[in-house]
């Protein structure tokens, strides 16, 4: 998935930056606002954010609109780059879940450096319904599920059972398995009606379509769609638009069609959280996009 995004980065820029990174030690440092975190030397985040100014910039804006009470959940927390960004714009507790042990070790070390108040709880777990199993394999800053492995899944509901605070946001980035992650948390979705943010438009169009129907029955009726560079494409649309995007992106993978979008990010809201979502979108337009 990230390979398509990489192909849209100017080749000369990508090669120069990547070659420079390969001269660095196996771990390097990257600044995210006030925090400096450790990342693998081959991690693609610095390249993408250098080339695309809106890449991974929305979530800190969204979290800045949250009340001080309530939990944020990051599934696919990687080495803690998203956590490092959002903890600077809100006061909430954060649950950071990462299934790939080498990334989890870096995540935990980063939290020791940037989270002296222990607001963030790191969990090493593979999240899902159990319909899929495997082992995570890392490549240039992202980890994908290798179905030949035997790693056991834990449901999101089970992992979050110990938290009694309302869940405000569930962010999922698991490279193609986001739908299965969310389907493992339906009790949490019903109880808290959190905002949802996931990476969509993958080869799993059918599993996503099933997930859309499930969350729609829980009250999720309004969606915002961002392209893979972080720019807003659709506001307050319905599930039909999401299904159309999924089929479009699936055609790039399965039918060798030419395209400019390799995936989309989706924000989902119930009527309960619409004021927060709308305020965040307006702030993002004003302070990030239209500058």
Predicted segments, located by residue:
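Conserved S-adenosyl-L-methionine
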Residues: 123-125, 220-230
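Active-site beta-loop-alpha junctions enriched in small/polar residues
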Residues: 201-203, 228
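Proline-aspartate-enriched helix->loop->beta-strand connector
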Residues: 194-196
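S-adenosyl-L-methionine
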Residues: 1-110, 115-121, 147, 160-164, ...
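Short alpha-helix
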Residues: 207-215
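Short internal loop-to-helix segment that lines adenine-nucleotide cofactor pockets
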Residues: 50-73, 117, 121-122, 130-192, ...
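Short strand-turn motif at the edge of the Rossmann-like AdoMet-binding core
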Residues: 99, 175, 199-201
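Short, conserved loop/helix-junction motifs that constitute active-site signature segments
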Residues: 86-90, 185-192, 215
């Amino acid at each position: 998935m990230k390979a398509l995004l990489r192909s849209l980065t100017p080749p000369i820029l990508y090669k120069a930056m990547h070659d420079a990174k390969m001269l660095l030690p196996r771990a390097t440092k990257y600044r995210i606002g006030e925090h400096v975190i450790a990342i693998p030397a081959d991690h693609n985040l610095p390249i993408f954010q250098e080339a695309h100014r809106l890449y991974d910039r929305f979530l800190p804006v969204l979290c800045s609109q949250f009340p001080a009470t309530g939990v944020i959940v990051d599934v696919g927390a990687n080495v803690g780059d998203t956590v490092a960004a959002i903890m600077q714009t809100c006061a909430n507790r954060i649950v950071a879940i990462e299934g790939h042990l080498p990334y989890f070790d870096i995540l935990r070390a980063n939290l020791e450096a940037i989270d002296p108040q222990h607001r963030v709880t790191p969990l090493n777990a593979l999240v899902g319904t159990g319909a899929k199993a495997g082992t995570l394999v890392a490549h240039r800053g992202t980890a994908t599920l290798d179905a030949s492995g035997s790693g056991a899944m834990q449901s999101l509901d089970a992992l979050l059972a110990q938290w009694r605070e309302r869940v405000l946001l569930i962010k999922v980035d698991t490279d193609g398995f986001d739908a299965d992650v969310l389907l493992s948390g339906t009790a949490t979705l019903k109880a808290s009606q959190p905002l949802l943010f996931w990476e969509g438009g993958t080869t799993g169009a059918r599993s996503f379509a099933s997930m859309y129907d499930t969350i729609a029955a829980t009250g999720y009726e309004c969606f915002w769609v961002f392209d893979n560079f972080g720019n807003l494409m659709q506001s307050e649309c319905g599930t039909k638009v999401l299904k159309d995007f999924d089929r479009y992106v699936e055609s790039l993978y399965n039918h060798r069609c030419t395209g400019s979008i390799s995936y989309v990010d989706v924000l989902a809201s119930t009527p309960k959280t619409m004021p927060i979502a709308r305020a965040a979108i307006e702030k993002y337009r004003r302070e990030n996009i239209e500058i």
